[in-house]
Structure formats: C-alpha cells, structure tokens
Amino acid sequence: VDMGGIDGMISKYDLIPNESIRKNDRLRAYIKEVKSTPRGAQIFLSRTVNDMMIELFEMEVPEISEGVIEIKAGARDPGLRSKLAVKAKDKRIDPIGSCIGMRGARVQAVSNELNGERVDIILWDEDPAQFVINAMAPAEVSSIVVDEEKGSMDIAVEEDQLALAIGRGGQNIKLASKLTGWKLNVMSLADADDMQAKELQKTGEKLAEKLGVDAEVAGVLID
C-alpha cells in the first residue's frame, strides 16, 4: 500500500473475506502496528479489527466524536455481522437512533465500507445481566441466570426464539459473548426448567443427607 513514501502492508487475513481489492484501489484501513526498519517505518494495516468499525462510527456520528455518545465495546465477524455497544452521556439523547441515523444513513455508510457487514447497535448497561439481554437482540430473552464465579450466564428463550438467539452458525451468541465478555449458554425455556428441576433435586438430596431427613422434608426446607 502506497502511503506517500511510507510502506503500508495489509495481509489477506486483515482483509474482509470476499472483498475484491485491485491495484490502485483507494482503501480505508486501521493502523494496527508500526515497526521501525532499516528502510524506515513500516505500517501494518487491517480492515478486520474491531477498531476499524469503531473509527468508522466516530467519523460518521458527530455525537461520538464530540464525546456525547460513548462506544463501550465492539465485536465483529468481519464482512458478515457485528455488534456495537453504545451509551449516551446525556439522557436526552438516543444513542441507538443517533448511530443508525436518518433512514439508517449512518449505519449504512459504515456497513458499505465494511463490504456489507450488518451492524447491530446495542444499548450498553452497567448491569451485566441487562447488558447481555440487550446484546442478544434481535432475540428476546425470557430469563437469565448469572454465575459470577464461572463468569457465565444461562439464557432461556421461548422455543420460537432459539434459532434467532443462537444465530447462523452460532453467530449471534458468539458476538454477544465477545461484546459482553461473558460465557453465554442459551437454551429453550423447557430445557431451562428441566435443568433447574435437576439442580433442585441434587440440592435436596445433599440437604437430606446432611440433616438426616427424607427428601420430602428437604424439599419443603428448600422451598
């Protein structure tokens, strides 16, 4: 890549899959590393890192560059889909609407630059469980159980929401996990109920053994 006398390099792994780049094409890319060599500075570029998407939104959305809206996190499956978590510092401002723009113009401009990558704008929340619920969009979460020790959450959804929650090839759940930093397990409500019943049974058996009472009494104590 010619950068006015400075060498810029971009590997095929840093190009968005299936995008066609020809010689002399103008290209937007993120500077991910700069190295000093005997020939001078060498710049390594990427179009697949999260920061590429974040920088594009800063260019397209004035509220972000002005500091009114803050980007809290980003996660990408380059060229296919990504999620961006945002927060407004001014409660009067709608951060999602601002990032989408009039008739979707702002988010579409970013998508076009990223070879048609679909971008979900997510509302960041300081409550980790609520943040995960938001990140699972467009799927609707019915219930969520947090295990802070394991850094995981069990997410239950209606049966007709299960495919949407998982996404094609697990894309939605993987992006939500990357975005929030939590290990996420998604299941149907029926499976969640079965799992809860088994956990209660195990707890009851342990309590009955410890107290020397039968399972029925232990069950009453748990209730």
Predicted regions and their residues:
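RNA-contacting regions in translation and RNA-metabolism proteins
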Residues: 1-223
